[in-house]
Amino acid sequence: MDFIEHLLPELLDKILSYLTEKELVTFSKCCVKWREITNKDTLWLHHCMRRGWLRFGLNGDINRETHLNVKMSNIGGNSPVFQLYVPEETRLSPVCKWKNIFIRVHHLNKNWRKGRYSVSPLLKGHAEKVTALACNGKYIVSGSEDKSLRMWDMAQATCIKKLDGHLDTITKIIWKGNTLITGCADSSIRVIDSTNFTLLFSLQGHSGSVDHMTLVGKVLVSAATDRTLRMWYLPDRRLVNIFRGHTDDIECMYSHGTHVVTGSWDKTLILWDIEHAEQFHMYSGHNEVVTCCYFDGEKIVSGSGDNDLRIWRISPPGCSHILQGHEGEVYCLAANHHVIASGSSDSTVRIWNYNGKCQHVLQGHLGIVRCLHICEERLVSGGDQKKVIVWDYKKGVQMNIVHRHPSLLHLMWVNETKLITASPERPGTVAVLSYW
């Protein structure tokens, strides 16, 4: 006798909601009927939500994620490719959306954890080193010291568009919808249609290299070596404000909501209120250049050439914690709601909590740690000697080393399935690693 037949559907759903995903799978193997009972979006949505995986079905659908089509290097048959076998003739209904997402994300995270990835052929075409990168998940746009802008099809590993016209090194790229915005060492900002790679208009006003940009709604905020920030209202191509406050070159920028933080060689940070077009506060305390910064709307985190990180209060303004431990300059940082990760010239990555305590010291790099990316599941660090490492930052342990990274790197872009880096060497190359 099947006891399930005697349970009200609401009670059965309630009972099943207490099962773990492994228990659900075991339950579903008993018979076709039990498999159908567990093949419900409500059950698997719960497990995706509990693990923080809703973004895979809401912000983007991993069920539509495709594999790269080009012939890729895959040593040892350690393929990351996902294949869900479904018999051609079956009595079973199709796997429901959120169960499919759960299975795929579990496979994806296992790829990152086990080091299962494929390496695309190097993207070659730039005559000089690549100095700027942007990606929308399907295409890559790169800028170079050779003054050209290129678009690459990741699936085919080919350059599909090229734009000349910049008069100097391309320093920064923002990609928003069908619009590309480039900052250039020729002091200009260019707005480009990404669909046909044509120049829409340019913005003139800076008197130095435009090295940093961020979008705040329809307002573009740019920072240049002329030590100013400028606000541009893009719909009517208008300069709406000029901010002055730093007394030396601006080294880093980070935005959140309607506020922008900048760090400078003058050893200070400034929080700017873009909505009200004013300087909110200047933060002083570092003894060397502020190399990197982060802002979440409530607090600022900064790293410096003085080897320290600092956490700053917004209200009342001031330094709440000094994070000491690195034995070399702090080159980069990445943060989320739980922790701060910092990379240094001392070859280590440190994990800190927001009370200023160092939780883990991650060792494995040789030379400077130049790039960091953090998400809920992992931390990725890139540094000298072609070395990229994937960490479980919660436990403070190394998941794997990307042994087949093909080139040196100084820029890194990471999403859920791809790892993209640019080399500081000439001629410029871009490397693509796929974990899917």
Please report, for each region that a protein language model flagged, where it lies by residue:
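Intrinsically disordered, low-complexity acidic/Ser/Thr/Pro-rich linker and tail segments
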Residues: 1-5, 22, 28-29, 33-151, ...
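WD40/WD-repeat beta-propeller blade N-cap
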Residues: 51, 123-130, 164-170, 204-210, ...
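WD40-repeat beta-propellers
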Residues: 149-153, 173, 189-193, 213, ...
